[in-house]
């Protein structure tokens, strides 16, 4: 498949994922999955008269695809995530529409692009009108028990421009916290009960999830558990319990690692802290040590995922619980000579996505899907699972048809937005399952606007910008797609937090002098 080739490009090692990776307790599920009880071939949403499924949504922070065995890295240990991949479906072409935590988490919750919900650092909190139609609220209204643990990543406000509050009262069980939260469980006020046994936050969230599952199973009501791990976000703070996992290990660098593989990138992309962090975060001279702590943090998440899945089995709800695992954005980890995230390149914007629906006949086959999906698609996916009609005005589309038909398609393109950081690095890109077009508008102080075009099917490492090559028809096609998203921005952006003027800034046909006036407002 195209996606498998895409992942093999990142590292030289690529493990074979078995068709099924069941524990001993999973054989009953295998039997159940063979029973022809699904009238729907493409989706497994809740239909009238059916028992509503439970939903477990697991979100990490800053996790790149090559931190997992099931995405092609045989040098890391992610047994529970690899088992989830074998039990469910892996999505190889899943992107975040904004590659920074606050906006991406709002994208996920609301099913809307950033310019539609208006929530990000330097802009503002999520407006209550958008939160009111988020998946946690809509599922609770549908009768679901809901729980939230970890880093929710944003606050909710009723007045644009004003500080918001955490939506504590909107969940039946709360284990989340403000801001970035802490790796020290004792510092997370809503999680202090777990601090003695689980002093590091990652395992504490696994324990929280297990406890909620036990409580919800007694209620005989469907539940939705959302767990948002801080890991593997900086500062690197691995759980000491796992210190031996990667002690003394070395790691294969991605084939696009280092500054020499980023010389063709737009000059604008080097003006943010992502460029500085290649050296500042020691990717250049201490790669093995840096990646050992990074992978160690992911390992603790993997343990927590195992705790949650074990609880589903223990309390007899596994066969009716859909598990979704993904990340809010990726991480560059030295690729092209950059660190951190935000930029529209693959390591930053393409993230893991695994979905396991044990009720579906396609489960247990280790299937992969290389159709384009986005983080905004997760909200309508969750709603369809629960049998809830999506509200109007969202940008996402349910992924469930792809679970039934991995060769299908739910969208042709997706915008990749950045309006955070220095204005020089503001960018808007559009991606398809095979191509990516990036536009860098900044033209001040000797700069010129830059176009980048990549064939991500043939060149997944983004080593050749073909915007000035022979692909004229492809370039024009991607320009038209890009212009269409600019038009959407102009028509649908929220009227606050300074989002509407960015439609002018990203318009390829507007003179720089007119864009400067927009930035100065």
Q: PLM features: residue spans?
A:
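Bacterial N-terminal signal peptides
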Residues: 28-39
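Active-site-proximal N-terminal segment of extracellular/periplasmic enzymes that hydrolyze or transfer
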Residues: 48-89, 95-98, 140, 461-473
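Active-site-proximal cap/lid insertion segments
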Residues: 49-50, 62-75, 178-203, 212-373, ...
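Loop/turn elements at helix/coil->beta-strand transitions in domains of secreted/extracellular proteins
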Residues: 51-55, 87-92, 142-147, 169-172, ...
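Short, solvent-exposed turn/loop segments enriched in Gly/Ser/Thr/Pro and often Arg
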Residues: 70-75, 89-112, 125-126, 148-161, ...
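Polar, surface-exposed loop/tail segments
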Residues: 78-79, 108, 142, 151, ...
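Catalytic-site neighborhoods of secreted/periplasmic enzymes
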Residues: 107-206, 235-236, 418
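C-terminal cap/loop subdomain of S1 sulfatases and analogous C-terminal strand-loop tails that border
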Residues: 160, 172-173, 178, 329-335, ...
């Amino acid at each position: 498949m195209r996606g498998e080739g895409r992942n093999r490009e990142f590292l030289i090692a690529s493990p074979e994922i078995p068709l099924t990776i069941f524990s001993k307790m999973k054989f009953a599920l295998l039997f159940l999955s063979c029973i022809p009880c699904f009238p729907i071939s493409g989706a497994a949403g809740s239909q009238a008269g059916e028992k509503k499924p439970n939903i477990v949504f697991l979100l990490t922070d800053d996790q790149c695809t090559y931190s997992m065995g099931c995405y092609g890295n045989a040098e890391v240990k992610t047994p529970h995530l690899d088992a989830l991949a074998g039990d469910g479906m892996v999505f190889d072409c899943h992107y975040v529409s904004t590659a920074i935590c606050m906006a991406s988490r709002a994208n996920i919750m609301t099913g809307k692009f950033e310019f539609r919900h208006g929530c990000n650092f330097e802009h503002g909190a999520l407006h209550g009108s958008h939160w009111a139609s988020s998946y946690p609220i809509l599922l609770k209204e549908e009768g679901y028990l809901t729980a939230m643990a970890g880093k929710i990543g944003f606050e909710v406000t009723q007045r644009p421009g004003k500080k918001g509050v955490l939506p504590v009262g909107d969940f039946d069980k709360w284990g989340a916290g403000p801001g970035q939260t802490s790796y020290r469980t004792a510092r997370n006020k809503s999680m202090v009960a777990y601090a003695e046994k689980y002093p590091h936050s990652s395992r504490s969230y696994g324990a929280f999830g297990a406890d909620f599952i036990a409580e919800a199973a007694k209620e005989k009501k469907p539940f939705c558990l959302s767990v948002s791990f801080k890991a593997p976000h900086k500062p690197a703070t691995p759980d000491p319990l796992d210190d031996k996992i990667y002690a003394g290990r070395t790691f294969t660098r991605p084939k696009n690692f280092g500054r020499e593989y980023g010389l063709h990138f737009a000059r604008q992309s080097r003006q943010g802290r992502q460029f500085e962090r290649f050296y500042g975060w020691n990717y250049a001279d201490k790669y093995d040590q840096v990646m050992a702590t990074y992978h160690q943090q992911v390992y603790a998440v993997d343990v927590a995922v195992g705790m949650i899945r074990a609880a589903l089995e223990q309390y007899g709800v596994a066969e009716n619980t859909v598990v979704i695992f993904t990340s809010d954005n990726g991480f560059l980890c030295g690729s092209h000579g950059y660190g951190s995230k935000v930029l529209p390149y693959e390591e930053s914007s393409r993230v893991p996505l695994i979905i396991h629906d044990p009720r579906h006949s396609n489960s247990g086959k280790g299937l992969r899907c290389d159709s384009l999906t986005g983080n905004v698609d997760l909200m309508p996916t969750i709603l369809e699972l629960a049998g809830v009609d999506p509200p109007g005005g969202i940008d996402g589309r349910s992924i469930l048809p792809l679970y039934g038909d991995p060769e299908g398609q739910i969208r042709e393109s997706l915008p990749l937005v950045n309006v955070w950081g220095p204005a020089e690095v503001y960018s808007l890109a559009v991606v398809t399952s095979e191509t990516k077009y990036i536009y860098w508008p900044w033209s001040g102080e000797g700069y010129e606007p830059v176009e980048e075009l990549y064939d991500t099917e043939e060149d997944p490492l983004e080593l050749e910008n073909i915007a000035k090559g022979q692909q004229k028809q492809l370039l024009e096609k991607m320009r038209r797609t890009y212009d269409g998203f600019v038009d959407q921005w102009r028509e649908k952006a929220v009227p606050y937090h300074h989002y509407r003027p960015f439609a002018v800034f990203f318009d390829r046909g507007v003179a720089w002098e007119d864009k400067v006036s927009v930035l100065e407002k």
